[in-house]
Amino acid sequence: MFSGQGSQYVGMGRALYESEPTFRHHVDRFDEVTRDKTGTSLVARLYGRDARAGEPFDDTHVTHPALFAVQYALARTLQARGAQPDIVLGSSLGDFVAAALAQVAPAQEIVAWLIDQAASMARACEPGFMLAVLGPASIYRGSDTLREFSDLVGVNYAEHFVIGGNRADLVRVEAALAREGVVFHRLPVRFGFHSRNVAPVVPWLHAREANLSCRAPTIPWASCTAGGIVEAPTARFLTRIAIDPLRFQEAARAIEQTGSPDTLHWVDLGPSGTLANFARRLGVPNDRLHVVMGPFGDDARALGRVSNLHASNARPAGAPAAPVSEGVSMHAFLFPGQGSQVKGMGAALFARFPDRMRLANEILGYDLAALCIENPDNRLGQTQFTQPAMYVVNALAYLARREDDAGAPAFVAGHSLGEYSALFAAGAFSFEDGLRLVKKRGELMSAARDGGMAAVLGLDEARVAEILALSDLRGIDIANLNAPTQIVIAGPADEIRRAQQWFEQGGCYAYVVLPVSGAFHSRMMRDAQREFERFIAPFDIGAPGIPVIANVTGRPYRGDEVRRGLVEQIASPVRWVDTIRYLSEQGVERFAEIGTGTVLTDLLRKILPQKAGASGAAARPQAGAASAVAASAPPRPTGMADAQPPAASPARAATAASTMPPASASASASAPAPAPAPAPAPAPAPAPAPALAPAFARAPASTSTNGIAPAARVEQLGCPEFKRRFGLKYAYVAGGMVHGIASVRMVVAMAKAGMKGYFGTGGLSLDAIRDAVRAIRGALPAGEPYGMNLLSGRLEEATVDLYLREGVTSVEAAAYMHVTPALARFKLAGLSVDRDGATVSAHKILAKVSRPEVATAFMSPIPEKFLERFVRDGVISDAQARAARAMPVADAVCVEADSGGHTDMGAMPALLPAIRRLCADIAGERGYRDKVPVGVAGGIGTPEAAAAAFVLGADFILTGSINQCTVESGISDVVKDMLQQINVHDTDYAPAGDMFELGAKVQVLRRGVFFPARANRLYELYKQYDSVDDLPDAVRRQLEDKYFGKSLAEVYADCERYYPADEIERARGNPKQKLALIFRWYFGFATRAALAGNEADKVNFQVQCGPALGAFNQWVRNTALENWRNRHVAEMAARILQDAADLLSRRYLSMVGR
């Protein structure tokens, strides 16, 4: 278990730093990172001569990396002693330590992130702190002062909770607690982590989440941020660790459910034993609780006790302990593959190991020494001979190294073929079995025909994958990731030849076709892979005795994975960059290339430029071998590794079927049907979506759960007042998306299903909006409620006039910073007084807000100056004005978190509670008769997200991005085909075309397009140059040829035809404004191309979209809904609501122990 801020003190871990080399080694590593980034030494602050116990230690720039370093170093020390955790638990900053131990992200990367996070908090956040309160959380919930001036950060057990906030506010809270006689104490921190105090740093965190790597945990990770086991962490999740509330009790219960509590030992590796104390209060017996560090304990003796404790327990199968060196540094052996062979290799080794050579000759049927020394008929260049030769030379070199120097490596790894040598060195199989496997592998690969390979130099993996996705090269896979910008591709020979033009135009500085006849490590090797799988089946392959890094994953093999990994390696990429970075992250500082040549040493310098390289020729017993292969620039591409298809490649491994319920009576009651194969061309429009009632009928009103509480039903989700006010059955809204993407069909489908849809009016003419209103009204003869989008801007007044003429009574107000006269006029036009004297407001406004000051404007009555003017002008009566003063502008407020399109990058868990409180406070102060419902939008694409929103108090949810990829969406089918493929990381931020000069951002699709990169480039050019004439010739040519497809003069002529006359007049007198108009033209062009589905301009598509759609795609993967042609907006809403209700019921039962 790893704790967070508040548990630190000067001198934590001093005894371990002085007595344990492994502990000292890791602390020193992070001391170097901290000194490089801040100029401050962790070691000096913790253990230096001027470091005094008891002095304040709350400088986040130091405490962030110090807490991480000490806890991580202690965990690695235990691992070096053979103690491997079965599960890791993190709380607050401790979650980062747990993530690093579980290999979710590299430790040094996390430390750098924490240091940057601390710096950003210092810039953006007011001073704050946290209070630990001894007493039940009901104290907080029952105190107006506590709820107003602080946030509940976490409830650790029945009599202990933590609150946080701004310093000035918490002083009031302390006074209130003192008056009530409640015991509390301040934690030694400078900020109120997990509270409103750190909300200002959220945009910074989200904007820089790409700086964090994120992989699936190799050790089960229980997170207090998640309140359970984290199975598929994202970079966004890691950024939330300092922001979201802590849920220690839920995380602890999740751990207990992973195994028998009677055999579970809870080891607190934090500085103060904080989490062990919490676990004890939750009922964990003392003999199952262990603390290593403490300000007054004997850390070294406690470390010994924990090490002995774990030594008596069985190690989980397949988890070999890394033999971490207790000396100055760890080292790893690297074994090269094809590409390193030279005539004369192994000459000094063959006579030294005659028995091994006799075995090799018997297995191969020829004289291996003669092959290597004489190279008859250039056979060393033929893979069926190269592979056995390299394996034997590598193996003998390893044996010689061990005889000459008994030190065992901490890790071993091999490149492609070299992985077999690494596995032999680790004892996974015998010398002769390894040779038999390699012989067969070489024979199968030599039989491959019609394939080719090429090295792409100068581009990284993402760029190579992007070019492959955008090209017509459908058969090419990435085969080797040798260095960050040295990548080998493989595929059909004709495509490999054609690919040269694509990559050279894409910016590579060299494209080298390799002299091979097969597309090794690509999908073209699938037949060979299947044959090899049959061949390897009877071999005796055991668990490696030394950790071996697998080519396919870049992570260590577990005991039962080796056979499968060698089979997959035939047709999967060699992730050599990941391999080396992983080894470096584990503390490896010395690399020895075992075998012949210096290919891997050369690559090492490119992957880890801060390290001089491997120990090179000194690591090999062969004199002169290093000079046998001359280093080149760029270095010679190495062995052909396995390749998975890039993003655009079709075949993907199947995952577990979704557990979503069917949404129609005819659907199967079990798992959804498998997804159909992607259609080669757009299919005819499917039949209308099925009725929703059967989907919701699974949870009848009488359903209960073991007599504890009724199961959550869909109708119960959200606020009854919201549903009553807007005439809905369900608390679900489909928001308006511009250019009619939120279409007539979409609005009608939602209305007929008892939900609300808003037509997307942005970018449309008044005539088009009028036609849409009439079409919707005609399709809803029963008068089902619908809504129209209303945007702040130059068409606002005319649009309100249109709505009043056409009888529109419900609008979604978007992009407003304040209440305008037009919006007030729409509201007032619906006010009347009934026969009982009560005010009736027939016109409903749902206001989308992302900032507290905007929420305040909509929660307030219509500004008095507007009312006075409207009365004076006869627009409204005195009675209407009096009624307006007693009600807010908005009938509902929707808090907009980080969404597709325009976004302030807000975080739902921070924004929603804050604005809910704000709205409640304003309503109370003004004495409003009715509640103003507060809902949420942004990031809702799965039942889990919907459930989280309702748990946070949302009165309704609003979705956007996921509806864009449906049958009813008004976007082109080409875009829908692209959108159904995206994942959560496939969006990016780009300048907003309508607010280009201000630098406002929109969130857009990144995968498969150049728009975000080009749009950001245009904004940088706009900042750099003052006129079109200032643009360098090379830049002008690039814009005209690559971006616009026409001359800048032609673009400006288009602007003169499109933009209002007053804007053109300003541009004629202001060269900077003219430049802006020309650049803004690109944004309109990119949007029009996407709407029309113009494939010739596909790379320029602007598609506003958020990561919620990526999450939805993952949820429905391998179900019928994977194909957008089966996605109906109302059916999707039904499934999300039903599964959210089911999830909430299950979570409740787990909380009460049922």
Curated annotation (Swiss-Prot):
SUPFAM superfamilies: FabD/lysophospholipase-like, FMN-linked oxidoreductases, Probable ACP-binding domain of malonyl-CoA ACP transacylase
Positions of region (Disordered): 627-689
InterPro entries assigned: Ac_transferase_dom_sf, Acyl_transferase_dom, Acyl_Trfase/lysoPLipase, Aldolase_TIM, FabD-like_helical_ins, Mal-CoA-ACP_Trans/PKS_FabD, Malonyl_CoA-ACP_transAc_FabD, Malonyl_transacylase_ACP-bd
Biased composition (Low complexity): 641-672
Pathways per UniProt: Antibiotic biosynthesis
Phenotypic consequence of gene deletion: No production of thailandamide antibiotic.
Chief location bin: cytoplasm
Functional description taken from the UniProt entry: Involved in production of the polyketide antibiotic thailandamide. Probably has an acyl transferase activity and could also have a flavin mononucleotide-dependent oxidoreductase activity.
Organism per entry: Burkholderia thailandensis (strain ATCC 700388 / DSM 13276 / CCUG 48851 / CIP 106301 / E264)
Name of this chain's protein: Polyketide biosynthesis protein ThaF
This protein's UniProt keywords: Acyltransferase, Antibiotic biosynthesis, Cytoplasm, Transferase
Ranges annotated as biased composition (Pro residues): 673-689
Alphabetical GO biological process terms: antibiotic biosynthetic process; fatty acid biosynthetic process
Record GO terms (molecular function): [acyl-carrier-protein] S-malonyltransferase activity
Gene name, Swiss-Prot/TrEMBL: thaF
Keyword set includes Metal-binding: no
Family under the similarity heading: In the N-terminal section; belongs to the FabD family.
Recorded catalytic activity of this chain's protein: holo-[ACP] + malonyl-CoA = malonyl-[ACP] + CoA
Segments for region (Acyl transferase): 330-714
